[in-house]
Amino acid sequence: MKRIAIQGLIGSFHDIAAHLYFEGEQIQLICCATFEEVFANMKKDPTMIGMLAIENTIAGSLLHNYELLRESGTTIVGEHKLHISHCICCLPEDDWDTITEVHSHPVALMQCRQFLAHHPHMKNVEGEDTAGSAKMIAEGQKKGWAAICHAEAAKLYGLKVLENHIEDNKHNFTRFLVVSNPNKADMLRPLMEANKASIVFSLPHEEGSLSHVLAILSFYKINLTKIQSLPIIGHEWEYLFYVDVMYNDLTRYRQAIDAITPLTKDLTILGEYKDGKQTN
């Protein structure tokens, strides 16, 4: 049985993404309060797998997770893109006219601003987790309180769904990375099926240094799908570049990496894996 460390509780979006990615397999979830705790658990138990959100189509990148990933020494072995849909739920005996507060993670509240604007009498209260808000209301029998979470979390904690799909943007997806100890990577993903890679590097503080790297990737027909820069602490105006690329020829990809390595500093391959499917 695979043991998967996630941030959040049972019923959270990490839980849903993990079960979809490992569909048909037996898994045991290790629920963690923070992403730091996810990597700490993996360090203590090298057989453990981690799953963490890395970017959202509305909220953008989770910048801190890039740093945690790079510093952890783990490797990316897969990804999953999950459609994010929210519902508002409450205790079975409550209804619209009794709700005075709505609790959820601040990002979830932000993603439902238009819906909440139509219910100004509901006080918005930020919590640490979408599923955690549902659990708190259910276990504490918080009358007059509602939670914004996934419908599966509402069902799990026995809450009544007042309305589903309340998110402002229906094209809201979060990309999750699956990470493991490098020594276990080949057991979790066949390298020959990989068509995507995540790399990180810094560059000399010289004119055109980034464009030279991008030109080489283009020459080798490597498709750049994402680039994210983060400042290097203690080095003013210098940056780490986190880059995702896709390829259909492993040899040509390897040649491209060999070609850009002399132009970069501290280039690290964070993972080579198969482009993840997107679920609605």
Annotate each language-model stretch with its function:
Residues 1-280:
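Domain-level signature for soluble enzymes in the chorismate/prephenate branch of the shikimate pathway
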